[in-house]
UniProtKB/Swiss-Prot annotation:
Residue intervals passing through the bilayer: none
Organism for this UniProt entry: Schizosaccharomyces pombe (strain 972 / ATCC 24843)
Similarity-based family: Belongs to the OSBP family.
UniProt keyword terms in alphabetical order: Lipid transport, Lipid-binding, Transport
Protein purpose: Lipid transporter involved in lipid countertransport between the Golgi complex and membranes of the endoplasmic reticulum: specifically exchanges sterol with phosphatidylinositol 4-phosphate (PI4P), delivering sterol to the Golgi in exchange for PI4P, which is degraded by the SAC1 phosphatase in the endoplasmic reticulum.
Annotated Gene Ontology cellular component terms: cell division site; cytosol; membrane
Molecular function as annotated in GO: oxysterol binding; sterol transfer activity
A Pfam family of this chain: Oxysterol_BP
Name this protein carries in UniProt: Protein kes1
InterPro entries to which the protein is assigned, alphabetical: OSBP_sf, Oxysterol-bd, Oxysterol-bd_CS
Length: 388
């Protein structure tokens, strides 16, 4: 197995530095085209120079890039302690998922839309002698949806979920509504934590340096009765700070006053205190998101990967893009996309459907619906279940 981070760490970078002066006019033309587009922006073909050489399917690895936190979740002695640990682990996933590329390269890049059936698998080594394993599959292309399953058998920690998105242009921003939810299972305690996702806003478009800000709320709802509500906000024209994170933990069953408050930046320092003692001296460090380094995922070398594994699918495109040869990159991308269109035509002609390898859709997730009753409106939503 070869080691590399699951994000754009090893493959995006040099192309960024060559980008701005040579492609500024093309960038502005692209912005004008999306400003007049009324549908879901994910269906648009983006020019190669704004693309990442990493497929969106790899983003599922961000959930476990701090494997020591992931496997430690069952160690909390009480349901409340475990709720706090799960909240800390979730907060640790945000920076790399939404901000690391901008900090590393100076601007956000559009990840590649995975092809239907695309796979990304790998594992993290841990100090308990059992690997944490990831399996992710692109289960839908229109709309794009990735299903994923992350498991450490010895620790008894399992995460499964699916992410899709719908995006639209609004003024100077692109808003991305994340579709789906995740379920974190702590097997030693027979607990399930249902996780929803924040709104993603792409800022800085007209300056040619796009970056991500998070908005609205997301929730972590435990079958033990505890609820974490996280509110995200960013810097406005006159007020606010970038990447603001404010959370409360309550017992949703008893509808008590909040027990904990957690505040700070999801790219910097988070502090917490009990709700009863909110004096400044009572706030303690919760998580230093800015200096919490991710752990690389191990993936098979490209030459050992199957034909649908992500880095093999996009190998030629990535080589061309990293060399700054945007014409060749566009040609390679078009070749892949046309091959997919031909497969769909053949399936339609022979009245066939694509069969998913690892996941199965069910129209109901009754546990999620029951858990979200503690919110103002319960959420009725299906789920992509992992085929064990």
């Amino acid at each position: 197995m070869s080691k590399t981070t699951s994000s754009d760490d090893s493959r995006d970078g040099e192309g960024d530095k060559r980008l701005r002066s040579t492609t500024k006019s093309t960038w502005l033309s692209f912005l004008k085209s999306i400003a007049t587009f009324s549908g879901d922006l994910s269906s648009l073909t983006a020019p190669s120079f704004i693309l990442s050489s990493t497929s969106l399917i790899e983003y599922s690895a961000y959930w476990a890039e701090h494997p020591e936190l992931f496997i430690s979740l069952p160690r909390g002695e009480t349901p409340l302690e475990r709720q706090l640990l799960v909240t800390k682990w979730f907060a640790s996933t945000l920076k790399n998922q939404y901000a690391a590329r901008n900090e590393r390269y100076g601007s956000e890049k559009k990840p590649l839309n995975p092809i239907l059936g695309e796979l990304f698998t790998g594992k993290w080594n841990t100090d308990i002698g059992e690997d944490t394993e990831l399996t992710s599959e692109q289960v839908s292309h229109h709309p794009p949806i990735t299903a994923y399953h992350i498991y450490n058998k010895k620790a008894g920690v399992r995460l499964e979920g699916y992410n899709g998105h719908k995006s639209g242009f609004s003024g100077p921003q692109i808003h991305v509504k994340q579709i789906g939810h995740a379920r974190l299972i702590l097997e030693p305690h027979n607990e399930v934590y249902y996780i929803t996702f924040p709104l993603v806003t792409l800022e800085g478009l007209w300056y040619g340096s796009p970056y991500i800000e998070l908005g609205k709320k997301s929730y972590i709802i435990s079958t033990s009765g505890y609820l974490t509500t996280i509110e995200y906000s960013g810097k406005g024209y006159f007020t606010g700070k970038k990447n603001t994170f404010k959370a409360t933990i309550v017992n949703a069953k008893t509808k008590s006053e909040p027990i904990y408050r957690i505040e700070g930046s999801w790219t910097g320092m988070l502090k917490y205190c009990t709700f009863e003692d909110q004096k400044r001296s009572a706030w303690e460090d919760f998580l230093d998101c800015g200096n919490y380094k991710p752990v690389n995922i191990s993936v098979a070398p490209i030459e050992e990967q199957g034909e649908y594994e992500s880095r093999r699918v996009w190998k030629n495109f990535a080589v061309a893009l990293d060399a700054g040869d945007y014409a060749a990159a566009s040609q390679e991308k078009s070749k892949i996309e046309e091959g997919q269109r031909e497969l769909r035509r053949q399936e339609e002609e022979h009245n066939e459907v694509w069969h998913r390898k690892y996941f199965e859709w069910k129209d109901k997730d009754e546990g999620f619906e029951e858990a979200t009753k503690c919110l103002r409106q319960p959420v009725k939503e299906g789920f992509w279940y992992y085929l064990r």
